[in-house]
Amino acid sequence: MIDTSDVRKMNMNAIRAVMWRGGEHTKQSIAADTGLSVATCNTLLNELERNGEVHGQKYQLNGVGRSTSVYQINEDYESILCVRIDLDSEGNRLLLCDVLSMLRSTLYQEQTQFTILDMDRVAGKITEMLEKFPNISCILVGTSGIIDHGVLRLSDIPELEEAHLLDALRTVAQQRPIYMTYDCQYRVYGAYKDAGYTSETLTLLFCMRNVLAGTASVIGGRIVSGKNGFAGMTGYMPWGMSQEEQIQVIAQGSPKGLELIVKTALSVIAVLNPDELLFAGNVVDREMMEAVQTACAKAVPPEFLPKLRLADHRGDQYYLEGMYQKALEMK
């Protein structure tokens, strides 16, 4: 049962969602966008203004008549820390930190390369970022492995395997909320939001040289994680080769790599029947994409074939977008 405080929080977040679009808004326009009464918007906007989350200013519209209060987000009020733990195709460990405003403006970017990237180094970098930006209100962490109840497993970075990463980061987060998940889940969520989907099913197939290929899916607006984050780990399907062999085969491309990618795509189509299958990473290029489309079209009746699309720029733009969208939901 939803109590009064829950309703109030939902109403507040509905107003925030409008404000996060940027620009200036009146109580009347926010009421129209949210379906809330003008009186409710007035009460909640006054609170947001007192807290410093929004700025309010009185204007005379068209220079005549009574003045009207106009509100916009205060970008200095809070920020979002996005931390990506990554491994490039040469095996270098990367720690990428981005600080975003609630309007998605990039306030700070940093990339650090490591020979060894363990839990202490990740925690140390987050501590450093919190000292530099004390208005950080939430922390998003993306990993190159699944998060099983706070423990990093199947990590592409060996020294982070079985790391109790969530507990370690909560220690340094100083009460700030943390959301942590497999990198591909952020990518697919960012792509889903970018496409404007709400009820559709989108699957991302991520193929990167020197790491195990995998998938991530969003169904009806919800990320599919499974019992402990293993959902989408197609590299553990019985392809007749080890995970190490799969990595080598996919890195080589055609013909064996293409065959494995097609099998993976067909398994996703058969199990999830998605509206769209998005290919990302640095293995599938436009030529290979055409071959994948041809092979899938031969195997699947046209009425069941999803839209097959190759992401621009390896799909990297969706990673940060997925983190930003998750941060908005954490309010």
Kindly give the residue locations of the regions a language model identified.
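ATP-binding/phosphotransfer module of carbohydrate and carboxylate kinases, centering on a glycine-rich
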Residues: M1-Q57, N62-R66, V70-L107, F114-E128, ...
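Short glycine-aspartate micro-motif
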Residues: I80-D86, C138-L140, T201-F206, G214
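Short, acidic Gly/Pro/Ser/Thr-rich loop/turn segments
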Residues: D88-E90, I146-D148, L212-G214
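Short, ordered coil/turn segments that flank beta-strands lining enzyme active or ligand-binding pockets
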Residues: V99-L103, D148, I219-G220
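Hydrophobic "anchor" residues
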Residues: L103-T106, L152, I223-V224
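Glycine-rich phosphate-binding loop and adjoining helix at the ATP-binding site
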Residues: L107-D194, E200, M288-A299
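Short glycine-rich anion-binding loops that position phosphate/pyrophosphate groups of nucleotides
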Residues: S144-I146, N210-V211, V283-V284
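Glycine/GP-enriched mid-protein hinge/lid loop-to-helix segment characteristic of carbohydrate kinases
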Residues: P177-I269
